């Protein structure tokens, strides 16, 4: 299940682009806590701490206890923006979690047993169709990863979502089809050129022309 962490934040006074730039110059990142029937609460967070959490992975499926001026709120990140050039966080949104709440989250898939997959051992290639699956999950038991086992997959076979065991209390958002998760693509076989065809080709791909026949000797009169 998703790991729970503690995050410190402060109340953000100003809003807008100018205030956000000023906050970033101070080494902090603007954010907001919303949902749960309460008013949105603008906050700021430490840049280094937030940057580390984002790039550690599973950020959007991690539950946080955010402490704002001594009061803790249980939240989950719902979105964040990165600088398109530097890759640094610019803003982050958190959703409040109330007891008994249900969320829609995109949970990443982890593929295991590739080393014993018969299709891969025979030269096939793993083609991952989906890297994550959207689920309805209980807020207090949110999975951070799903496991897809490749141990029995043969060449040209596909794995569908029905092959993945979902954690208790979790269900698929899309229930109208058994969609594909991954396939084992057959190896590409390159046919060799026929020897006779290759031998008949000279430089430039053309055969040598036959020598002209000798001219007949003139008849004696």
Swiss-Prot record:
Source species taxonomy: Bacteria, Pseudomonadati, Pseudomonadota, Alphaproteobacteria, Hyphomicrobiales
The protein's name in its UniProt record: Large ribosomal subunit protein bL25
Gene3D superfamilies linked: Ribosomal protein L25, beta domain (2.170.120.20), Ribosomal Protein L25, Chain P (2.40.240.10)
Gene Ontology CC terms: cytosolic large ribosomal subunit
Superkingdom of this protein's organism: Bacteria
Low complexity biased stretches: 208-221
An annotated Gene Ontology molecular function: structural constituent of ribosome
Keywords, in A-Z order: Ribonucleoprotein, Ribosomal protein, RNA-binding, rRNA-binding
Family per record: Belongs to the bacterial ribosomal protein bL25 family. CTC subfamily.
SUPFAM superfamilies, per database record: Ribosomal protein L25-like (SSF50715)
UniProt record, GO biological process: translation
Purpose of the protein: This is one of the proteins that binds to the 5S RNA in the ribosome where it forms part of the central protuberance.
Subunit structure: Part of the 50S ribosomal subunit; part of the 5S rRNA/L5/L18/L25 subcomplex. Contacts the 5S rRNA. Binds to the 5S rRNA independently of L5 and L18.
UniProt source species: Beijerinckia indica subsp. indica (strain ATCC 9039 / DSM 1715 / NCIMB 8712)
Residue ranges, annotated region (Disordered): 198-221
């Amino acid at each position: 299940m998703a790991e729970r962490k503690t995050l410190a934040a402060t109340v953000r006074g100003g809003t807008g682009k100018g205030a956000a730039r000023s906050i970033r110059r101070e080494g902090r990142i603007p954010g907001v806590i919303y949902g749960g029937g309460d008013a949105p609460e603008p906050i700021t967070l430490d840049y280094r701490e937030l940057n580390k959490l984002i790039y550690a992975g599973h950020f959007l499926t991690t539950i946080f206890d955010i402490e704002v001026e001594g009061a803790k709120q249980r939240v989950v990140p719902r979105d964040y923006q990165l600088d398109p050039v530097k890759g640094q966080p610019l803003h982050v949104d958190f959703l409040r979690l109330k007891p008994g709440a249900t969320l829609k989250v995109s949970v990443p898939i982890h593929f295991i047993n590739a080393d014993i997959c018969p299709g891969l051992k025979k030269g096939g290639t793993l083609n991952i169709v989906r890297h994550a699956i959207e689920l309805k999950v209980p807020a207090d038991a949110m999975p951070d990863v799903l496991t897809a086992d490749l141990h029995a997959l043969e060449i040209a076979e596909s794995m569908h979502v029905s092959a993945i065991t979902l954690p208790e209390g979790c269900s698929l958002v899309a229930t109208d089809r058994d969609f594909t998760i991954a396939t084992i693509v057959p190896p590409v076989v390159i046919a060799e050129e026929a020897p006779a065809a290759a031998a008949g080709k000279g430089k430039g791909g053309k055969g040598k022309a036959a020598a002209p026949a000798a001219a007949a000797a003139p008849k004696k009169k």
